[in-house]
Design a protein with these regions (language model features):
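Short, surface-exposed, charged loop/turn segments at secondary-structure junctions
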Residues: 70-71, 113-122, 192-193
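N-terminal amphipathic, basic helical "cap/leader" segment at the start of enzyme domains
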Residues: 1-98, 204-205
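Small-aliphatic-rich amphipathic alpha-helix that forms the alpha element of a beta-alpha
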Residues: 39-40, 106, 115-164
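C-terminal helix-cap and adjacent tail motif
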Residues: 3-4, 8-12, 16-19, 173-205
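Short, hinge-like loop/turn segments at secondary-structure boundaries
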Residues: 72-73, 167-170
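Short acidic/glycine-rich loop or secondary-structure boundary segments that cap or lie
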Residues: 64-66, 108-112, 187
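A general secondary-structure junction signal
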Residues: 56-58, 104, 182
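Active-site-flanking beta-strand signature of metal-NTP-handling nucleotidyl enzymes
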Residues: 99-103
Length: 205
């Protein structure tokens, strides 16, 4: 089923974490950029502040990011943990085709806080909600294209060196890193579901 005929519910069900991927993708760079662009344009944000930001790293820039993650993590994590957990996973992510860095503009958030002081204290939390929706939208669209995708969090190790490498504006706060490529292996862990009845309440129906 193509992305054009996939229903929204089917796309939501299809979305999952796939970590074992390669850089041998059939999707065009233009299509990847279109997906991220549409996500940024249409994902909701508090008071329509449009604070969501993204940096798309492909091919060698993608690999450079994971080289940065390797060196930054090695310098910050105890050697046993780095060698057992960090290094193998970073190597796995480096083998992918691309990484999307998701940011939130602190200037955009502070602008709303200045205009509407009563919501200023809530803006950081709402910003996290907004960024999560942007990440989810892009993740779902990439999976609908047949890509394997996973969401990673290597902050704060990578924040400063990545900002320096790609000249990221100072007010952009890094939230997550989305790795994608051609699926080449099974999920590291199959999806399981707790009973919905224990997680949902309905009144008045």
């Amino acid at each position: 089923m193509s992305p054009n005929t996939l229903s929204l519910l089917d796309a939501i069900k299809q979305r999952s974490s796939l970590h074992v991927v390669s850089d041998d993708v059939s999707i065009s760079d233009a299509r990847i950029q279109e997906i991220v662009r549409e996500g940024i344009l249409h994902a909701p944000s508090p008071f329509n502040c449009q604070a969501g930001r993204a940096v798309v790293l492909l091919k060698e820039d993608h690999k450079k990011f994971w080289d940065i993650a390797h060196d930054a993590s090695k310098a910050s994590v105890p050697p046993p943990a780095f060698e057992k957990a960090f290094e193998p996973r970073i190597k796995m992510f480096r083998a992918a085709y691309g990484t999307i860095l998701f940011y939130e503009s602190q200037d955009a958030l502070e602008k709303i806080g200045s205009k509407v002081p009563m919501v200023k204290a809530a803006m950081p939390q709402w910003s996290e909600h907004s960024s999560g929706m942007l990440q989810y939208a892009v993740w779902t669209m990439l999976c609908a294209e047949g890509l394997g995708v996973s969401l990673q969090h290597y902050s704060p190790f990578v924040d400063a060196p990545a900002a320096k490498q790609w000249n990221i504006p100072a007010d952009w706060s890094l939230k997550a890193q989305m790795v994608f490529g051609k699926p080449t292996g099974p999920r590291l862990q199959e999806k399981t579901f707790e009973p919905v009845e224990d997680r949902m309440k309905v009144f008045g129906a």
